[in-house]
Amino acid sequence: KRLSKATSDVAPILWQHGALARLGKGESIHDLLHNGYSTISLGYAGLYECVKYMTGHSHTDNGKGKEFGLQVMQHLNDKCKEWKAAEAIDYSVYGTPIEATTYKFAKCLKERFGVIKGVTDRDYITNSYHVPVFEEIDAFEKLKLEAEFQNLSPGGAISYIESPNLSNSPIKIYLLITEAQATDKHLSSPFVINVILRTTFGSPFK
């Protein structure tokens, strides 16, 4: 209802100048919210914490925890389909990379539910479906596991593989890329590269 009252003036480059539409000034965007023209994202975070609290397991355990995590994800997708059928608006589950909001959400959960070991006892919650950073896991196993959750995040998702300096092992970079291609998943793999550049004045800087 709030969006239906918005006009093209809120973002002229999007709604007036062709990025998304060519509406007139002050024209309502209401009609463009319906019938497949645009999508409303249902973002989520903290799947690990949810599963840990409900089952006592991580969603990475390939057992009870993972099964429950996939059920939660399927339920989110089912609700999106239900809302779409009722409202003629596309909804889609989005594996949210919420960045700094992980700290805000953790603080809110702690204030609401208190300190729960393994759930609210950290200063952050885990992004979307990601394997929590404190769990040790092989890079390829991580991709394989997270691929199943990416399938249930059709509105957008990304998996991260943090790597050391791989400049001496380009084959490892190649294998990561081919694995991501094989699973048809969105992957980011930031890694350290130590370089020395020179400015136009000839003085080096790191």
Residue ranges: model-predicted function:
Residues 1-206:
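Long, C-terminal-biased catalytic regions of enzyme "large/alpha" subunits
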